[in-house]
C-alpha cells in the first residue's frame, strides 16, 4: 500500500513545475512528466506499473484503490516533480463532433452557444456530461467561420479518473 510519507511528499511538490500525463488501461498505469523549456515540451520522466487483474474492465475503473496505488507507485518510480496530473479518456468513452461556428465569437460566447446546442450532438443528458471544445486551426472557405471540435464524455468517466489521481496524492488538472 501507499507509504504515508510518499503521499505527503507528493502533496508538497511544486505545483507548476510540470504536468504529469496519466494513461490507465486494463493492464497498466502509465505516467509521463512533461515540462516546458525554451518553448518546447520535454519528457522529464516516465514509468509503467502493471495493474492487478480486474481493476479496470472494459475501460471502466472497478477498483479505484488498486489503480490509485499503482499510480502512486508509477509516480514514485518516475520520481516526478509535479503534483498536477492530466489524464486520457479512452476514445470509446468520448463523443466528438466538428461543428462550424462564427469566427468572431469570444471563447465565452462560443461556450454558451455550444452548451445551448449540445443536446443535438450528445446522446445523454447534459447534466451527466463533461464538455470541452477547441477551435481547429484548419481554414474554411468562408473566413468568417471556423471549425470547432466538441468533445463530450459522461461525468462518471471523469470522476472515476479524478478519484484515482487524488488517491495517488495528485491534483487533477
Predicted feature locations:
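Oxyanion-binding/catalytic loops of NTP- or PPi-dependent enzymes
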Residues: 39, 46, 55-56, 140
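Glycine-rich phosphate-binding loop signature in dinucleotide/nucleotide-binding domains
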Residues: 78-81
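Active-site neighborhood for divalent-cation/phosphate handling
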Residues: 84, 88-173
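Gly/Thr-rich phosphate-binding beta-strand-loop-beta motif of the actin/hexokinase/Hsp70
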Residues: 3-50, 83-90, 168
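N-terminal phosphate-binding loop and adjacent alpha-helix
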Residues: 47-76
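Short, flexible, glycine/charge-rich loop motifs used to bind or transfer phosphoryl groups or to couple energy/partner
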Residues: 9-10, 75-76, 138-139
Amino acid at each position: 500500500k501507499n507509504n504515508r510519507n510518499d503521499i505527503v511528499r507528493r502533496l508538497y511538490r511544486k505545483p507548476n513545475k510540470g504536468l504529469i500525463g496519466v494513461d490507465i488501461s486494463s493492464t497498466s498505469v502509465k505516467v509521463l512528466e512533461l515540462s516546458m523549456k525554451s518553448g518546447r515540451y520535454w519528457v522529464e520522466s516516465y514509468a509503467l506499473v502493471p495493474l492487478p487483474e480486474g481493476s479496470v474492465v472494459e475501460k471502466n475503473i472497478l477498483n479505484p484503490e488498486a489503480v490509485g496505488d499503482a499510480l502512486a507507485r508509477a509516480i514514485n518510480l518516475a520520481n516526478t516533480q509535479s503534483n498536477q496530473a492530466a489524464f486520457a479518456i479512452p476514445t470509446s468513452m468520448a463523443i466528438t463532433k466538428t461543428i462550424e461556428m462564427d469566427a468572431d465569437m469570444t471563447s465565452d460566447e462560443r461556450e454558451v452557444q455550444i452548451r445551448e446546442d449540445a443536446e443535438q450532438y450528445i446522446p445523454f443528458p447534459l447534466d451527466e456530461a463533461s464538455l470541452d471544445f477547441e477551435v481547429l486551426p484548419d481554414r474554411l472557405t468562408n473566413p468568417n467561420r471556423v471549425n470547432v471540435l466538441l468533445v463530450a464524455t459522461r461525468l462518471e468517466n471523469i470522476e472515476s479518473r479524478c478519484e484515482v489521481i487524488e488517491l495517488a496524492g495528485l491534483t487533477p488538472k
